Amino acid sequence: TKSVVANQLIPINTALTLVMMKAEEVSPKGIPAEEIPRLVGMQVNRAVYLDETLMPDMVKNYE
């Protein structure tokens, strides 16, 4: 299963857009790639670096 990975540096409190995210096979696994449409508009609660895997605790109100 692919996970959501940052396609660029995403500053803290930024609302996610499609261009900021990509799907990749990573370990450890993060948020599943099929969640990308749901993540659009949600804010990150810390800076996320290029190629960093998005984990559930990095996205505000993600459950």
From Swiss-Prot:
It is found in: Secreted. Its main location: secreted. One of its GO terms (cellular component) is extracellular region. Detected in blood serum (at protein level). The record marks Q8, N13, T17, Q43 as: Important for ice-binding. Residues 3-62 form the AFP-like domain. Belongs to the type-III AFP family. Pfam families: SAF (PF08666). Keywords: Antifreeze protein, Secreted. This is Ice-structuring protein AB2. Contributes to protect fish blood from freezing at subzero sea water temperatures. Lowers the blood freezing point. Binds to nascent ice crystals and prevents further growth.
